Every structure is written in structure tokens, then in C-alpha cells.
Amino acid sequence: MRETGTQISHNPSSNAKLGNGIARLPEMLNAGLNVGLGHDAAECNNSRDLFQVMKFASLMHRASRVDASLQQAPDVVRMATRNGSDALGHNTGRIETGRKADVILVDTKNQMFTPLMPENSDHLFSHLVFAANGSCVDTTIINGKIVMENRQLTTVDEQKVLEEANKAFRRVLERMVVPASANT
């Protein structure tokens, strides 16, 4: 697979929910394959929280192999950022000159980061993977543009988007579901 340039999207939460088994992630990584993280979609996972996916990606493999050395927090963060970007051919995933500025700012004053030893990067990575969730993100920057600041969206009316999404979903359901009167 490495010779063909195959890119892997590891979706541990949706695979578990759907009963699809556990990917051979340690073997893929040891073989030098590029593995990113994903969540599939809401209908396969019920969550789009990549922090939960990071946690599950680490814990699933540690528990199933009875080996706490697997999928260390910095490696899992790399899978969620750099590896995913590389797999998709995006110019993101790391902070470097010439790359798009896609960045999240995480509120380390959030209770999920307590206690915090900021001088210890392994401790910070551990909090990101095992304690944080999407609600810890304070600011989101996409291609250098702030799209969320202080947990408030800056480019769209969030309530309106949610209402429109729910209306669209109801329209899809109405087309899919056979009315009870059709069975009589």
C-alpha cells in the first residue's frame, strides 16, 4: 500500500458504532503508511467532534492490544492534523511559511485542562487527546480568516443555518417515509 501511495482515513468511532471491527492501525503506522483521522458522518457516528475521535483512536487500540504504549497523544494529534492534510493533498495541517493558516485556539483555562502543566508539551497533548472536546475550541481560523471567535461564529448566522438544516432534513424524511394512509 505504501508503494502505491495509498492514504488511509481511520474512522474508529464510526467503525465501532457500525460494528465494522478495529483497523490494524499499529501495523499500518509501522509499515510507514500515512493515516489520518476522520469521523465519517453524523449518521455513522452521531458526532463530528474530532477530539472524541482522537481519544477513541488511542483508547481503542490500547485496550484491544492491552498496550498503553500505542497511539501516544502527540502521534494521534499528528494523525488528526498533518496526516489528514497530507492525505487530502491540502496545504494545511502544520504551521509553516507558505501553508494556509487553518488554526484552532483551544481555551486551556477550560476545566478540561485542569490541572495543567503548560511547560510540559506531552501533558498538553495528553489533555488535547484524552480530556478536551470541541467545546474547548475558542477560536477557529480558516485560511487566515477568523470564522469563530470567543465561541461565536463570525461569518454565518448559526441559528439560521441550524434551522435550515433541520427543515431540509425533514423534507428528505418526508420523501423517504411512506405515509401510514398508504398502507390502507
Q: What kind of feature is each model-predicted range?
A:
Residues 2-9, 30-35:
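Glycine-enriched alpha-helix->loop->beta-strand junction motifs that scaffold or abut catalytic
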Residues 8, 40, 144:
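Residue-level signal for inorganic ion chemistry
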Residues 9-10, 105:
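Conserved beta-strand positions in the central sheet of alpha/beta enzyme cores
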Residues 17-19:
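Helical hairpin unit composed of two closely spaced alpha helices linked by a short loop
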Residues 22-26, 122-123:
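Charged helix-capping and loop-helix junction motifs
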Residues 26-114:
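His/Asp/Glu-enriched, well-ordered alpha-helical/loop segment
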Residues 81-184:
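Active-site microenvironment of metallo-dependent hydrolases
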